[in-house]
Amino acid sequence: MSSAEALAFDVIVIGGGHAGCEAASAAARAGARTALVTHRFDTIGVMSCNPAIGGLGKGHLVREIDALDGLMGRVADRAGIQFRLLNRRKGPAVRGPRTQADRKLYRLAMQQMITEQENLTVVEGGAADLVCDGERISGVTLADGRVLKCGAVVLTTGTFLNGLIHIGEKRFPAGRMGEKPALGLSERLLSFGFTLGRLKTGTPPRLDGRTIDWQSLDMQSADEEPVPFSLMTDRITTPQIECGITRTTPETHDIIRANLHRSAMYSGSIEGIGPRYCPSVEDKIVKFGDRDGHQIFLEPEGLDDDTVYPNGISTSLPEDVQLEILKTIPGLEKAVLLQPGYAIEYDFIDPRELKRSLETRKVCGLFLAGQINGTTGYEEAGAQGLLAGLNAARRAAGSEPVILQRTEAYIGVMVDDLTSRGVSEPYRMFTSRAEFRLSLRADNADQRLTPLADEVGILSEERRKRYLTRETALSHARMVTQSLSITPNLAGYYDLRLNQDGVRRSAYDLLSYPDINLDRLIAIWPELASIDPVTREALEIEAQYAVYMERQQSDIAVMEREERLLIPSGLDFDAISGLSNELKQKLKQRKPETIAEAQRVDGMTPAAVALLIAQIRKFGGRQKLAAETLEGKGAA
């Protein structure tokens, strides 16, 4: 191979964080010759902030990443040291799988998977510039002068884009503690005409677990039967740990109030907006000052690591104030601070600059994923990375992009929210953001998305076999339970209370009743005992939601019709009589591709949508007439 060939790729991914790893893996699985550009190999897969994966809404994203044969679920299963299923007592649609992770195990597992991936080369170095041929991306220039040629680039800069760390009055450029920021790329993005903004996130101090008084604290255990994230994981083998729970005190709050003027957040030093749902401890005291305390989870960062992450006291106060605060918190009175908490500001691009493929509208072949799009969280980043990497590979190959709809996946909900509404603060996923969350459950992510992964060529043979085995078992169990039926009278003999309407009900129908599970039906039909535990749970959940799913299908059909109604690229919004000048301007700026996208433009009314649909039909009629006229002239 010549040196020129060695520096030529189909796809280049910049950044080795959660978005970058998923992007690089997806592009390589799609058949693209891929380069992952990162400063150092040993920082690939580093968990910059909290040592945890999943949670409410976020756990759904991890399951969807896994269903598309991504990495995060498998890596989390290898590194997880405290698995807990959140909202266990609520319905399956809103349950959130979560695990604390051993930072070292997570990083090493991710690095191993990146190393083993075919078609993927890790290139150590800093990305200094993007190379374009006209309005199309053509390569990346590294800080050492090397130029890598490519057909598409995925930019996953995280908090490194003009990153600035704040600790009280101190501030210094960094991508995260101890690592340099990316300083040149923002200028290049501005030169392309992108709209950049500033966002902020923060992290708590790190503590020496050997100096914490664990005996005085309440402890929280892992689930007795850990539920893995990945279809590929048979069982969790990593030892499980406990976490400590403590609270801030009125004395803590007094110290924070007395030093607010020294906090970077409240002194005016930070212009970026922080995440609403992960507030700093200063924010908690200012906004919820009437509370006598705020909960703190003390999360060990590893099985052989004494570092503890105090989840709940993210701060940008000076280090001396952080030490004072620790002395007022039960169990932490003598805790040694290993690293101060800090806030970090960074550049992001208005995600309305993106198509739903995560390709930028202004530069062909340039894709963005992760915090550069205004999101917060490993899971949100990983999900975007997978979609961007897949579509970058398809762009390089000249194929049509993959678009996930709101009706198909939480990934589709997130991307649609970002590209249609933009962000005013860091975006995080919640189940409440999805209109169709009864069908977008964590437990059925494989059924929803694995066939798509197979169709677009990113599914391994091993996963295909495992998926088909599980689906075959579920299909057989469904068929068996639908073939068995019972009358209300006979059901009463087995203490099943049904309406005495004379209607026979199948075992599958009975599973939709809240007080009936498979264990109760085995007394009637002993053959059901042969259904394995995994299939049993899937069948019970499916049957439980079957009635609701039938009702929801009509709503899904309406949205899918709107998604299919395309807005022609040549449509003149200014020519639509009755549309306000404000809406005309917003539509020209946003350039929605479907009626569904147009409906989510701020200020769009039902009347405006009707006008737009009428104009599309009129435009389509003119196009058809023009085509017929051309055909007639050709025939003459």
Swiss-Prot record:
The gene is mnmG. NAD-binding protein involved in the addition of a carboxymethylaminomethyl (cmnm) group at the wobble position (U34) of certain tRNAs, forming tRNA-cmnm(5)s(2)U34. This is tRNA uridine 5-carboxymethylaminomethyl modification enzyme MnmG. SUPFAM superfamilies: FAD/NAD(P)-binding domain. The keyword Transferase does not apply. The lineage of its organism: Bacteria, Pseudomonadati, Pseudomonadota, Alphaproteobacteria, Hyphomicrobiales. Transmembrane segments: none annotated. Gene3D superfamilies: FAD/NAD(P)-binding domain (3.50.50.60), GidA associated domain, C-terminal subdomain (1.10.150.570), tRNA uridine 5-carboxymethylaminomethyl modification enzyme MnmG/GidA (1.10.10.1800). Homodimer. Heterotetramer of two MnmE and two MnmG subunits. It comes from Brucella abortus (strain 2308). Pfam families: GIDA, GIDA_C_1st, SAM_GIDA_C. Its cofactor is FAD. FAD binds at residues 15-20. InterPro entries: FAD/NAD-bd_sf (IPR036188), GIDA_C_N (IPR049312), MnmG (IPR004416), MnmG-rel (IPR002218), MnmG-rel_CS (IPR020595), MnmG_C (IPR026904), MnmG_C_subdom (IPR047001), MnmG_C_subdom_sf (IPR044920). Belongs to the MnmG family. It comes from the Bacteria.
